[in-house]
Amino acid sequence: MDYLEIKGGKKLFGSVYISGAKNAALPLIAMSILAKNDVVIRNIPQVADIKTLIKLLQNLGAVSKFENLDLVINTTTINSTKATYDIVRKMRASILVLGPLLARFGHCEVSLPGGCAIGARPIDLHLSALEKMGANIEIKDGYVIARAKDGLKGANIIFDKITVTGTENIVMAAALARGTTKILNAAKEPEVVQVCQILNDSGIKIEGIGTNELTIYGGGGELLNLNKICVIPDRIEAGTYLCAAAIAGGEITLKQVEPNHLVSVLGKLSDMGVNFELGDKSIKVISDAKLSPVQIITTEFPGFPTDMQAQFMALACVANGVSTIDERLFENRFMHASELNRMGADIKLNGHIATVSGVSLNGADVMATDLRASSALVLAALVANGTTRVHRIYHLDRGYENLEIKLQSLGADIKRLSE
C-alpha cells in the first residue's frame, strides 16, 4: 500500500495548475445518462472517484473513452439499470445516477452508497423528493429500488436541509420529467450552478440558477443533446494549495482557478495574515508562515466550505494563538484531529467545536481517515520538524490529482513510497 513521506521545512515557490473539480465532474458524468448523443467532457480530473463512476456507467452498458484528455461517453447503449454494490460501495456520489436512470428508464436499482465515513449523510432527501415526483421507492437488501411506471412528473420540492447531491439529483431527474418542478432550499454551490447551466444550454429551461429557489421546466421524457462540457476548476484543490503556501511559507501562483468560488476561503486566509494578488483566472499567494489564529464556522456556499475545514485545522495547529472551528454541516468530521495530535498538535474537541492552540509540530507516522483529512496531514507535514509518513493515502487519491507531483514542483520534499 502506498504512503507519502514528507520532510518539513521547505518553502514553496512556483506555479501550479488547478485540475477540474471532482465534485463538478461527477454529476456531469451522471448527466450523460440523459443524453442521446456522444457527450464530451473536458478538464476531467484523473482521480479515483471519477474512475469509479465511469466504471459504474460502463457496467450499465455505456461506452466511454478518453480522447486527448477529454472524456467521451455514450449512454444510448445502456442495457442495465442496476448499479451494483461492488462499485457503489466505493463512493457516496454514485447515488447521482439514481435520478437520471429513473427519469430515463422509469426504473432502477441503486445500491446504498459508500465513500468517506463522515457521520450521517442520509439520502432520504433524494428519495422523498423523487417520491413527490411520482416514484415508488423501497429499500430492499441494501438497494434503493425505484419505479416510475408512467414517468416522473413535476412537483414542488422543499428540502428540509440544503443538499448538494440531492439538488443535483432532482434537477437532473426534473429535466426529463413532465411538467414543472420547483425546488426550495436548493443548494447553490458552483458545482450545482454548472449542472443547471449545462441543462439550460441544452434546451431545458431553468430559472433561479445560483439561488436557493430553482424552477425546472421538464422536457417530458425527450432525451437531450448535450453540448461539449468543460468542468469548472476545483475550488477545494485550489484552497488546499493556498493553505500549503500559507503554512509552509513562500510565494506560489495558482493558475486555471476561479477566484469568485474562493471568497470565503481567501477571507479567512487574509484574517490569518496571508497576502494575495488576484487575477482573472489566477491567484498569487504570498506567506511568511507567521499565521494568526482564526475563527471558522462551516456552512453552505457562499459560506466557508466544510471540505476546507480539515486543511484550516492544520493551519490553526501552528498559528500564533487559539483558533476555534465550528463544524455545523457534518457530524464526526474531526477524525483528523487525533492524527494531528500525534504530531504534537494541541486540539481539544467539544462536540462539533474544535479549539486549537498553536504549537510547533513534529513529524510522525499518521493515518488518513478520509479525503480531506488526508490533505490536512500533508499540510501539517510540510511545516513539521523531521519526517512524516502519511498512510492510507488511497483516500487522498480519491480527490486529488497528482498531489505529490504538484507539491514537488513547488519545492516540497515529498515522495510516494510503497509499504
Curated annotation (Swiss-Prot):
InterPro entries: Enolpyruvate_Tfrase_dom, Enolpyruvate_Tfrase_sf, MurA_subfamily, RNA3'P_cycl/enolpyr_Trfase_a/b, UDP_GlcNAc_COvinyl_MurA. Coiled coil: none annotated. Phosphoenolpyruvate binds at K22, N23. Its main location: cytoplasm. One of its GO terms (biological process) is cell division. GO terms for cellular component: cytoplasm. It is an enzyme of class 2 (transferase). Transmembrane segments: none annotated. CDD domains: UdpNAET (cd01555). Its EC number is 2.5.1.7. Keywords: Cell cycle, Cell division, Cell shape, Cell wall biogenesis/degradation, Cytoplasm, Peptidoglycan synthesis, Pyruvate, Transferase. The modification 2-(S-cysteinyl)pyruvic acid O-phosphothioketal is found at C116. UDP-N-acetyl-alpha-D-glucosamine binds at R92, R121, P122, I123, D124, L125, D307, L329. Pathway: Cell wall biogenesis; peptidoglycan biosynthesis. Pfam families: EPSP_synthase. One of its GO terms (molecular function) is UDP-N-acetylglucosamine 1-carboxyvinyltransferase activity. The active site is at C116 (proton donor). It is found in: Cytoplasm. Belongs to the EPSP synthase family. MurA subfamily. This is UDP-N-acetylglucosamine 1-carboxyvinyltransferase. It comes from Campylobacter fetus subsp. fetus (strain 82-40).
